[in-house]
Amino acid sequence: ANSILAVSMANLVAHSKLVQKYVYELIPNIYGEPFLPVPFMNILNGGAHADNSVDIQEFMIVPHGFEKFDDALRSGVEVYHTLKKRLKDNGLATNVGDEGGFAPNFTSSKEVLDEIMMSIAESGYKPGEQISLALDAASTEFFKDDKYIIEGDALSNTEMSDYLIDLSN
């Protein structure tokens, strides 16, 4: 976001000068009415941020189905603690990675996502309706010789896209 943010801001400032308005006056006209920020909460780490065998760097939950920010935040904390209990109950490590998410050894990213989805449901929330998932794959960390080396496979660009689509299902 570093360069695109600067370009976007420069564009907004230039437009504000052109129409002779302050930037804050333009934002609702361009982007619509302000709305509640949605937290992205990192709850499980892999990749360069953890000493485990998970290739994807960050697995996040996105509590979006709430009217108040504190309800969204609370739901995320509840899922985090449910995940911790589930990990402990399954004999998995509850140590945290560099970014604050748990860093147990799972055998696949799908296994991680399944565990998070079960934690959401066990916490009493509706996966996909109230809380969704997000990934920061940090794929540059496992891109070698024009291939994505993930879970022991060497994937082309198209295969990597297909892999991520499969994960999302």
Predicted segments — roles?
Residues 20-40:
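Glycine/threonine-rich beta-strand-loop-alpha-helix active-site module
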Residues 33-97:
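Mobile "lid/hinge" segments at catalytic clefts and subdomain interfaces of large enzymes
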Residues 11, 76-83, 87, 116, ...:
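Hydrophobic alpha-helical packing residues
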